[in-house]
Amino acid sequence: MQWRLDKRHVSEEEQVKDNGLTLDFDEVARKGALGGGEKLLSKWYGIYGSRHPGAHMARVVIPGGVVTSSQARRIVQVAEDYGQGKISITTRQCVQFHWLKAPALADMLRDLAKDNLSCFHGCGDVARNVVACPLAETCQYKRVNVLPYAKETAKELTAMRDLDNLPRKFKINFSGCGAGCGQPFINCIGAIAVTRKNEAGDDEVGFRVVIGGGMGWEAFIGKELFS
């Protein structure tokens, strides 16, 4: 919970967030380390701390899990320059760098931006990376290619500053057919492409929407909201 049961008191985390979510990584580089409040705010920029003193993790947001060849080369270059030449690929289609040093975070983020890559909203109480089926564009069973839907949804949500500070993280998934390869039933919102015949007998494409799924301390399978 973000709030204590006594509503007159707000958690220290909420107090930090109420003071604004802006973080200057160039200032962090000048200081050589993240301060207490900065460690919390860095999550909104896709940066986590580590059990190892002085080491950080950065999560690159990749809507739909698809990168260009230029972006792939950029990811490799950033890993080699800042992250010991290693990356992790997450179950929600992000890329993570580890063993990052605080003074280098600003330069790392700038290098990613050269190929339109970002860690923004990679962590924290925000709408996280929007996921799509791994083979959204090519699967023979797809009702529709859901990759453009995932990318456009991510673009719209990332631009909404009033969604920067949600009560908890929020996860969205698009799946191209009922097989649900994008794991729609374990996300906050899962949109599963379906088809039906309209009055003229033509196929219409829409979505079956399930909500409330998750794999936290208490796992829940999403329930259908509408189709």
Question: For the regions a protein language model found, what residue spans apply to each?
Answer:
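Intrinsically disordered, low-complexity regions
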Residues: 2, 22, 114, 163, ...
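Charge-rich, low-complexity segments
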Residues: 1-45, 184
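Small-residue-enriched alpha-helical segments and adjacent helix-cap loops
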Residues: 26-34, 50, 55-204
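Short glycine-enriched loops at secondary-structure junctions
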Residues: 125, 213-215
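Internal alpha/beta scaffold segment
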Residues: 215-227
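FAD-binding subdomain of flavoenzyme oxidoreductases
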Residues: 183-184, 207-213
